[in-house]
Amino acid sequence: MTAQKMSAQEIIAFIGNAEKKTNVKVTFEGALAAALPENVVKLGNVLFGDWKDIEPLLANLTENKDYVVEQDGRNSAVPLLDKRNINARIEPGAIIRDQVTIEDNAVVMMGAIINIGAEIGEGTMIDMGAILGGRATVGKNSHIGAGAVLAGVIEPASADPVRIGDNVLVGANAVIIEGVQVGSGSVVAAGAIVTQDVPDNVVVAGVPARVIKEIDEKTQQKTALEDALRNL
């Protein structure tokens, strides 16, 4: 699913102007004495909505006044992505904010964190615990390893985001610094910290990362992706 592409300035405006909400789920006993506000949903003895709308209702419960509140944020500006119509595999525990693009047959593993404005290309896998910061872009058929970080850039608005090309492998726990571009076909070794742009079809490693060789047949075999993992 392709979200509308937003510039840094548009993202800043989106967050700044958004109504801040503390969404809660409240299970209560007793009866409500007041009418429900329009934006509060009641299913049986469970309420869903913003705490500022629900709190007054709970203050006026009749009979039994017991209730339990479940919440996962406070004054949140950006909701989580609605994943129902995305043609990709997204495992439980992935945290994906709204205004993220996830193309067909991509894979997002448990524990991955994807911030607003990020883009994940067709057939790309974001492994466990990887972080894609705001506006980070990954091309097609790439693999971002477990625990890797693609630094986000929302502020300052003039800064360039991280861009990863097609058919790139970023190893576990590697860090790609703000504004860096990694060329298509390249490999970033596990644990590398990439502070400068990486050309196409090379292997980089180290802290800071440096080119150690060009991609050869042996490297291609060791870093080949498995299409079966992307089947839906």
Curated annotation (Swiss-Prot):
It catalyses: (S)-2,3,4,5-tetrahydrodipicolinate + acetyl-CoA + H2O = L-2-acetamido-6-oxoheptanedioate + CoA. Keywords: Acyltransferase, Amino-acid biosynthesis, Diaminopimelate biosynthesis, Lysine biosynthesis, Repeat, Transferase. InterPro entries: DapH, DapH_N, Hexapep, Hexapep_transf_CS, Trans_hexapeptide_repeat, Trimer_LpxA-like_sf. It is an enzyme of class 2 (transferase). PROSITE patterns: HEXAPEP_TRANSFERASES. GO terms for molecular function: tetrahydrodipicolinate N-acetyltransferase activity. Its EC number is 2.3.1.89. Pathway: Amino-acid biosynthesis; L-lysine biosynthesis via DAP pathway; LL-2,6-diaminopimelate from (S)-tetrahydrodipicolinate (acetylase route): step 1/3. Pfam families: DapH_N (PF08503), Hexapep (PF00132), Hexapep_2 (PF14602). GO terms for biological process: diaminopimelate biosynthetic process; lysine biosynthetic process via diaminopimelate. Catalyzes the transfer of an acetyl group from acetyl-CoA to tetrahydrodipicolinate. Belongs to the transferase hexapeptide repeat family. DapH subfamily. PANTHER family: 2,3,4,5-TETRAHYDROPYRIDINE-2,6-DICARBOXYLATE N-ACETYLTRANSFERASE (PTHR43300:SF10), ACETYLTRANSFERASE (PTHR43300). This is 2,3,4,5-tetrahydropyridine-2,6-dicarboxylate N-acetyltransferase. It comes from Streptococcus mutans serotype c (strain ATCC 700610 / UA159).
